[in-house]
Amino acid sequence: MTSLIDLGRYVERTHHGEDTEPRSKRVKIAKPDLSSFQPGSIIKIRLQDFVTYTLTEFNLSPSLNMIIGPNGSGKSTFVCAVCLGLAGKPEYIGRSKKVEDFIKNGQDVSKIEITLKNSPNVTDIEYIDARDETIKITRIITRSKRRSDYLINDYQVSESVVKTLVAQLNIQLDNLCQFLSQERVEEFARLKSVKLLVETIRSIDASLLDVLDELRELQGNEQSLQKDLDFKKAKIVHLRQESDKLRKSVESLRDFQNKKGEIELHSQLLPYVKVKDHKEKLNIYKEEYERAKANLRAILKDKKPFANTKKTLENQVEELTEKCSLKTDEFLKAKEKINEIFEKLNTIRDEVIKKKNQNEYYRGRTKKLQATIISTKEDFLRSQEILAQTHLPEKSVFEDIDIKRKEIINKEGEIRDLISEIDAKANAINHEMRSIQRQAESKTKSLTTTDKIGILNQDQDLKEVRDAVLMVREHPEMKDKILEPPIMTVSAINAQFAAYLAQCVDYNTSKALTVVDSDSYKLFANPILDKFKVNLRELSSADTTPPVPAETVRDLGFEGYLSDFITGDKRVMKMLCQTSKIHTIPVSRRELTPAQIKKLITPRPNGKILFKRIIHGNRLVDIKQSAYGSKQVFPTDVSIKQTNFYQGSIMSNEQKIRIENEIINLKNEYNDRKSTLDALSNQKSGYRHELSELASKNDDINREAHQLNEIRKKYTMRKSTIETLREKLDQLKREARKDVSQKIKDIDDQIQQLLLKQRHLLSKMASSMKSLKNCQKELISTQILQFEAQNMDVSMNDVIGFFNEREADLKSQYEDKKKFVKEMRDTPEFQSWMREIRSYDQDTKEKLNKVAEKYEEEGNFNLSFVQDVLDKLESEIAMVNHDESAVTILDQVTAELRELEHTVPQQSKDLETIKAKLKEDHAVLEPKLDDIVSKISARFARLFNNVGSAGAVRLEKPKDYAEWKIEIMVKFRDNAPLKKLDSHTQSGGERAVSTVLYMIALQEFTSAPFRVVDEINQGMDSRNERIVHKAMVENACAENTSQYFLITPKLLTGLHYHEKMRIHCVMAGSWIPNPSEDPKMIHFGETSNYSFD
């Protein structure tokens, strides 16, 4: 509920009878005087279920309206109502972006009614009569509807109609110079100088903004047109040069086309020449054919006598050959008969020799047998003597040897099993030793490695981060774009600062990958996030300058900011500054005194604390400040835990000691295993020595067994030899007892019979030799006659062969020429030439006839000459530029050149027109802007003298109109230079003072119907606040100025007031009358609404 003066005491006095005198006048509701309101100013605002209000009304002054009240009572709700009620965007307020969030809790519908003073500038708006003094705009916000309902004078309209009305009234809710909410004060300080000029012009004279926009547009058009014109002029020069080149190419092309025409004409002439050449060749072929035919007939006539003689000789050779065959048979039979006699004689001679040998054998047989018997008997006796001397080993000896051999084999098997067991144990120990050695090497390497990726093996939830880091390392394109986590790339100078850093950086950020810019984020974020569940942090351009200098921090008892004791990748450190604010956290390894801590939690003169978080000793202190009421400050602290992260080295000293101890233990284990292995090796050597001894014993036994086997083998062989000699001796004795004298006599008789048979055969052979001689003589005579006849036949064959070869050759020539002449009469080539000739039109034939007649007269109408002409033309044409596109390009260049020569003068005129318009608009804008800014600067300087050292407003006018800007220059110390107002150089209170004074300086020049400033005095000290308040009151309450709204949560004593200003005190509480129950109470305390009759 809003109130100006509490009239309750007057009502109470009447009820108690303290003033019972009859009165001639009584209090009644007064009708407001609207004549003092400027067109477009706000007369009244009525709110229902809006933010903190259930139902309230603001009846406003046409000059300064100062809205005061405690924090949370609903002062800024008035600002929200003005913005949203006039169809403004929630962004202009700087709070929630959803309109439905402004509906009071527990309600579904909210209503804003704003009554404005009508203006002559309002035209063509439905439901608004120019005769009406006021315009009522109603906005109904429903939680369940996306769009609000709007009414003008209780008639429903669209939002665009309301926005049109607001624009016609020159209400600029998006202009920080007119509408500055509490949340957008800092935005005004960050407002760029170019934008500040635009907003200032809009507040004062919107028509000048149109001129500025036109100048910017004209300048852009001028630059674009000038660039285009320069390009076209250069293009004209280029095209003219290109045109000259193309004309030469066209001339070459015409020469090419002429030669091409000649080539085409001679190509068409070729069929005629070829037909002529073909006919000439055909006549030559016919003459050759006739000659071949005559030659063939002549050779056949010469061949006939020789053929008859050949036939007679062939008959004679045949008869003699038959006779020779018969004589040869007779001769062979006689020769065969003699051969048979020879064979019989040879057989008889062999038999005689054989019989004689048998006689000799039988005559000397008895002596030989006796000698053999004596020799065999001697061998037999000698073998018996040797056998008697040989001692055969006993069977038990061999059995003893077998037993000893089995014992040795069993013993060897046992020892080999033991050796196998030792080898198995040794292999296992070797495997363990290699494993221990690898572990020791790995741990030794971990003590010296610089790669911190091992940190990611400490926890299971870091496995995804480790895999993501490895993938980034495998992709060179991600290098310097995706940075590894802070726990790998950043370290503190010692363990205590590492614990500080771990306490201030949340765990998700400590393991997050840093993306250096938005382009890299767009390029690589999805490939990483699709594969791994990791966090990404994108670097921004946010400022990371510490809030106060390092010297101040040290004066307060700290060693510096936490960021001062951190090293590593600068970009990752910047990310930690932006996300965890480590550049704003002062640290001290010793604990601060209570007095030092009390000083830190005490707000500064501007009401704000210096640091929101500090670290001292082993405590982290968060200092929080309430946003409402007295803005109470309360600290909370927590103990700082030790961490394994952010260490200067990859591992802590404890980890190093632990790993070194593990390495020592591994070495001891390795030596123990080695000792065991040495013992096993010695044991194995003993077993191998035993095997060697057993092998030696086995060799001795084998040698003994071999010797015994050899004795047994020799005994058996000797016994067998004796038996064989005995049998042989018996056989010889039997043979010696036989009588062979009769056998010798029989063989002598057989020899006599054979010699008689031999004499008979020799007599028969003499007779056969005589017959053979006669047959041979007759055969030789017949063979001579046959040879002579065959020689004559062979000679005749040579003669006939010559005639046959000649005949075949001539016949082949005849057939070939006959066939060739037949084929040449109508060849496919000849037909194609004729078809081509017939395809020519009459004009072509006439042209060709003229050329042919010319060549015929010159004696050159032949294929060779025409072909030479074609070859020459083709050689010449190959040297000629025949780019057929040259004509087209020349036409295009000519057309383009003609068009450019036509358009360039017109563009030059247009450019001059634009330049003239620029000059004209510049002459209009610059003096007015200079005058406005000069007046604003003078006004601002006068106002600023009361709170600071000096202030000024400058209009910067570079060549580019888009860069024209206003710069607010201030200084708060006499020896300091003027500096531009921005969000970095000045403190919050200094920015607030500068901002409000600039807005006050605009007051008398602005054309806006009203201006709103919400809690601009935050951060000011009481002196500056009084000075600013006085300046604001004096300017806002001056004549012919726009309506002004100032919202503030505090009200100092001794402020300057003016009779035209109105104070609206916003109060809340259970004791406040409820206007929903008693509608009259909504006007309770508003003295401006009462009059006395």
Swiss-Prot record:
Any one GO MF annotation of this record: ATP hydrolysis activity
Quaternary assembly: Component of the Smc5-Smc6 complex which consists of KRE29, MMS21, NSE1, NSE3, NSE4, NSE5, SMC5 and SMC6.
Biological role stated in the UniProt entry: Acts in a DNA repair pathway for removal of UV-induced DNA damage that is distinct from classical nucleotide excision repair and in repair of ionizing radiation damage. Functions in homologous recombination repair of DNA double strand breaks and in recovery of stalled replication forks.
Region listing for Flexible hinge, in residue ranges: 442-650
CDD domains: Smc5_CC_C
Misc. comment: Present with 892 molecules/cell in log phase SD medium.
Highest taxon of the lineage: Eukaryota
Gene Ontology annotations for the cellular component aspect, listed alphabetically: chromosome, telomeric region; nucleus; Smc5-Smc6 complex
Source organism per UniProt: Saccharomyces cerevisiae (strain ATCC 204508 / S288c)
UniProt-listed Gene3D superfamilies: 1.20.5.110, 1.20.5.170, P-loop containing nucleotide triphosphate hydrolases
Gene assigned in the entry: SMC5
Subcellular localization(s) per the UniProt record: Nucleus; Chromosome
Lineage: Eukaryota, Fungi, Dikarya, Ascomycota, Saccharomycotina
Coiled-coil portions: 208-354, 404-441, 651-757, 884-926
Domain notes: The flexible hinge domain, which separates the large intramolecular coiled coil regions, allows the heterotypic interaction with the corresponding domain of smc6, forming a V-shaped heterodimer.
GO aspect biological process, one term: DNA repair
Main location: nucleus
Binding site for ATP: G69, P70, N71, G72, S73, G74, K75, S76
Name by which UniProt lists this protein: Structural maintenance of chromosomes protein 5
Family as reported in the entry's similarity comment: Belongs to the SMC family. SMC5 subfamily.
Protein modification: Sumoylated by MMS21.
